[in-house]
A protein has these predicted regions:
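Catalytic or ion-translocation cores adjacent to nucleophile or general acid/base/metal-coordination motifs
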Residues: 105-107, 134-148, 168-175
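N-terminal metal-binding scaffold of metallo-dependent hydrolase/deaminase domains
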Residues: 1-40, 44-48
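Hydrophobic faces of well-ordered beta-strands that scaffold small-molecule active sites
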Residues: 53-57, 114-116, 139-144, 177-181, ...
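Histidine/acidic residue-rich metal-binding segments in metalloenzymes
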Residues: 126, 158-264
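Metal-associated gating/positioning segment near the N- to mid-region
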Residues: 45-130
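Gly/Ser/Thr-rich loops at beta-strand to alpha-helix junctions
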Residues: 112-113, 118-123, 146, 186, ...
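Divalent metal-coordination and catalytic microenvironments
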Residues: 9, 25, 30, 47, ...
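Active-site mouth loops of central-metabolism enzymes
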Residues: 80-98, 143-164
């Protein structure tokens, strides 16, 4: 049984009403407890802030896009190198560090939980392998659905239950936290060398629009009673004015579609 006593901690925890109190924190098996035995490991935190770990709710540290960055910049692995020290693995990479490099750097900033912003379902296994190689943080991921044909079929049929079944099965299969739409329908157009210029422009080869995809996804997630508060980060009409060109939406971006209803 692993026990730790953090002594003389300058604790800041507003949720618990603690605003800079000096106190000892007993920990057993990774959980704060009332007391520990006299044989515990003692850490003197005097002179240091002690506060709950940070949560980065949108990061890109694992998965296909990160690895493409590594493929395209092999010279980057010569930068950011650190040797192995004790239990710490060697690291490399500055622009796109290795998983261990990401983990150690986040730890230095006080982060203990990371949400990978976009996990491709077909590459979910490798994404989770990278999670396992990120030793200092709890990891979770939003799952990409913006080009999912099964979801498109449900949207075209206006069938919320079918959409919920697709989303629920996929999240369960890939162990995803929430759903992620990045340029819904636009990625389908890119496959044919085309693009979408508006939220109501039809998706090529489908009798649906990006608005339909977003609306159906929101309704399906509410139907599933996905936990946590409703957090919509929707940037669907971001326009860029370039001299001589009309306004054009740059990206349809919907992250972490969840509901404020409790899980059942």
């Amino acid at each position: 049984m692993h026990e730790i006593l953090i002594k003389n901690a300058f604790v800041i925890d507003p949720v618990q009403g603690i605003h800079g109190d000096i106190m000892d924190i007993p920990i057993r098996e990774g959980r704060i407890v009332d007391k520990v035995s006299g044989n515990c490991e003692v850490i003197d935190a005097g002179g240091n802030l002690t506060l709950p770990g940070g949560i980065d709710s949108h990061t890109h540290v694992c998965g296909t896009k990160v690895n493409f960055g590594r493929y395209m910049s092999p010279e980057d692995m010569r930068a950011g190198r650190t040797p192995r020290r004790g239990a710490m693995y060697p690291t490399s990479g500055y622009t796109v560090p290795t998983t261990y490099g990401n983990s150690y750097r986040y730890s230095r900033m006080g982060y203990t939980t990371l949400l990978e912003g976009a996990m491709a379902p077909l590459e979910a296994r490798h994404t989770h392998e990278e999670f396992a190689a990120t030793p200092m943080q709890d990891m979770l991921a939003n799952t990409l659905f913006d080009g999912n044909w099964s979801l498109f079929e449900a949207v075209a049929d206006k069938d919320i239950r079918q959409a919920a079944a697709v989303i629920g099965w996929t999240l369960s299969a890939v162990r995803g936290f929430g759903i992620k739409l990045t340029n819904p329908g636009g990625t389908e157009a890119w496959g044919f060398g085309d693009d979408l210029s508006g939220i109501d422009e039809p998706v090529p080869n489908w009798d649906i629009t990006p608005r339909d995809i977003i609306d159906t996804s929101i309704n399906a997630c509410e139907f599933l009673h996905l936990p946590t508060r409703c957090i919509f980060t929707v940037t669907i009409l971001v326009c860029l004015e370039i001299t001589g060109l009309p306004f054009r939406p740059l990206i349809f971006h919907l992250i972490s579609i969840q509901t404020d209803r409790p899980s059942t």
